[in-house]
Amino acid sequence: MELEDPTMADSTIKLTVKFGGKSIPLSVSPDCTVKDLKSQLQPITNVLPRGQKLIFKGKVLVETSTLKQSDVGSGAKLMLMASQGLHQGEGPILKEASIRPISRTVVSDKVDQRKPSVLVDKNRTDRWKATGVIALAQANLKEIPEEVWDCGSGVRVLDISENFIKEVPAKISSFGSMQKLFLQGNGLSDESIQWEGIASLKRLMLLSISHNNLTVLPSAMGSLTSLRQLDVTNNKLTSLPNELGLLTQLEILKANNNRITSLPESIGNCSFLMEVDLSANIISELPETFTKLRNLKTLELNNTGLKTLPSALFKMCLQLSTLGLHNTEITVEFLRQFEGYDDFDERRRTKHQKQLDFRVVGSGQFDEGADKSW
């Protein structure tokens, strides 16, 4: 029988971290620092390292100390306490992911599934055909009414948001003049949407599919070359497709409150982007191609795992005046080290002063954009 090498046994220790009603088993080196341990716990718990307090035998462990120096050995049980707000993604992972506290409104509270669907009469369909606008939000619909499909190619706007619709069929391609499509708040899954139909809408400028249950966006999205606004907030997306870079007319991208871990480098091709919101995701870095977004004015990255930014972001993105980095590992002091920061700071202060001059609500307090030293 082969004997276990005692040096190997000493090279790792097995410990348990208790957090949010669950026990997290870990095998780590005794020479691992408490700071390194916190970094390992970040993707497991979604709590940023600076928001973690590790407690062993009633004492808070010091970040710079090793586990050996802290008398943490095999079999040790640590407790993790999380500071409120200091998390990436939607929040700390508590117990099992299936009962994770997600603040996602899939269907509006105003919609009662027990109520009958809105009646589609001739007056309504005549109005649809005359205006090209089909408005059926919060109509308690289980499916898209047949009368909608009878409206022909003149339809410019279709709003079927906040219903209970479970299928968007391929025949939506018949609306060749469609410019705006609102599908948010229906609980749509990946299987619910026949993407080849939507992808054929070459004139589509606005697509809202927020507050659904999508886990992936298909490569067919790249066919929507007229798209200017894309809202995929509050889904379960883990990535954005590489074909995002084909949406060269895109001006607004809202993808906050998902589970996105990385971004395609092709996003740099979306040179008209003015507003990007990626808050409450699990992103740890931005591609350097972000510096190609010369029209970027607003970039929201709050509650992510970011530790740094593209080195030339402030130098190259000369329109940037709003930056949100609260509850990340990036501090104001860190930002000030970047080339071009002073010019960026001047732009955002000028914007803030204009808001004060025009008495914009909520503009009374100047926002530094990131947290101060911690």
Swiss-Prot record:
Keywords: Leucine-rich repeat, Repeat. Residues 13-87 form the Ubiquitin-like domain. LRR repeats lie at residues 128-151, 152-175, 177-200, 201-224, 225-248, 250-270, 272-293, 294-316, 318-340. This is LRR repeats and ubiquitin-like domain-containing protein At2g30105.
